[in-house]
Amino acid sequence: MTKQVLVELGERSYPIVIGQKLLSNGEPLARYLKNKNILIVTNETIAPLYLEKVQAMLSDFSCVTPVILPDGEQYKTLSQMDSIFTSLLQQNLGRDTVLIALGGGVIGDMTGFAAASYQRGIDFIQIPTTLLSQVDSSVGGKTAVNHPLGKNMIGAFYQPKYVLIDTDCLSTLPKREFAAGMAEVIKYGIMWDAEFFSWLEDNVEALKALDTHALEYAIGRCCEIKADVVEKDETEQAVRALLNLGHTFGHAIEAEMGYGVWLHGEAVSAGTVLAAITSNKLGLVEESIVCRITALFAAFDLPTSAPETMNFEQFIKHMRRDKKVLKGQLRLVLPEGLGRAGIYSNVTDEQLQEVIDCA
């Protein structure tokens, strides 16, 4: 069964289509690709698995070219993105071109940013192949590359025209990558939907076994929540910032440890537990809630504490560069219970040090 979620943004609205065997049927994409040149951006890991299948799906289109990039967060850079621009320019491709992002979050972010930048904007389509990209990064129009001094510091808000989520892609996903994606799934339950959080607690084994119905429900619910939030606040001026639960701590871990050493979802897992502990210290949540949050991450073999090699000074150095910082003041997304979160700027360095030291 195929599920569709619509991201309603007026003239820039687009569908998210979720189901099995979607890479075998190009018909749903046809109207978005009519009379267009197509450049498929993928990486060295995904290309042998799915590039041929996508090219076959697009066999009715005359100009379909791939660009194959190295795989890994450490390659999410302006210099690597230049390979996309070079391919476009060498083929004299203009604004009648569609970029297709075939891969995980890194490929999606880079392709989207390239689409936003090339000739001041061309269309792009997301075909996410990892759980993390299916439930989070492919939806909502955040595109970016990293800088040595911070994650996702160079980018743009730029919405795709279409998101195609084939859940069969998860069958080739390494277990560590699947677990990292579950960190973002769990995040939605904590910050938006307590009932979904409880459902996740009850369905750990089904999800780990890649049960089709469980996966499609979880991915669909995450996309519904993400669409709802993006419709309310596309450019993260208010409620969309809640989607960054765990990310201020998490981005600090990624930057300090070196991009790719910790997967993004692993850093978000540890970061969300740190945020929950901070909430408990501030009296926002009971310790029992912190225990449930920690236990659910642990059930998917995700880290629930900071790296032993990181100290408070290293954390705070990176956290001060967070995009939510306002007038020099750190703003943290903290859980207020299950299904609720808020933004707090009253957390002192002393309180943060206590949280980090005890984690």
From Swiss-Prot:
InterPro entries associated with the record? Dehydroquinate_synthase, DHQ_synth_AroB, DHQ_synth_fam, DHQS/DOIS_N, DHQS_C
Which residues does NAD(+) bind? 71-76, 105-109, 129-130, 142, 151, 169-172
What keywords would UniProt list here? Amino-acid biosynthesis, Aromatic amino acid biosynthesis, Cobalt, Cytoplasm, Lyase, Metal-binding, NAD, Nucleotide-binding, Zinc
- Biological or metabolic pathway of the protein: Metabolic intermediate biosynthesis; chorismate biosynthesis; chorismate from D-erythrose 4-phosphate and phosphoenolpyruvate: step 2/7
Q: Which reaction does it catalyse?
A: 7-phospho-2-dehydro-3-deoxy-D-arabino-heptonate = 3-dehydroquinate + phosphate
Q: Does the keyword Membrane apply?
A: no
**Which cellular components does GO assign to this protein?**
cytoplasm
An example GO BP is:
amino acid biosynthetic process
Q: Provide the residue positions that the database annotates as binding Zn(2+).
A: E184, H247, H264
Cofactor mode of binding and number, as noted:
Binds 1 divalent metal cation per subunit. Can use either Co(2+) or Zn(2+).
Q: Which GO terms describe its molecular function?
A: 3-dehydroquinate synthase activity; metal ion binding; nucleotide binding
Q: What is its EC number?
A: 4.2.3.4
Q: Where in the cell is it found?
A: Cytoplasm
Cofactor(s) listed: Co(2+); Zn(2+); NAD(+)
Say if the entry is tagged with keyword ATP-binding: no
Chief localisation class: cytoplasm
Q: Which family does it belong to?
A: Belongs to the sugar phosphate cyclases superfamily. Dehydroquinate synthase family.
In terms of PANTHER family, this protein maps to: 3-DEHYDROQUINATE SYNTHASE (PTHR43622), 3-DEHYDROQUINATE SYNTHASE, CHLOROPLASTIC (PTHR43622:SF7)
Q: Say what the protein does.
A: Catalyzes the conversion of 3-deoxy-D-arabino-heptulosonate 7-phosphate (DAHP) to dehydroquinate (DHQ).
Name-wise, this protein is 3-dehydroquinate synthase
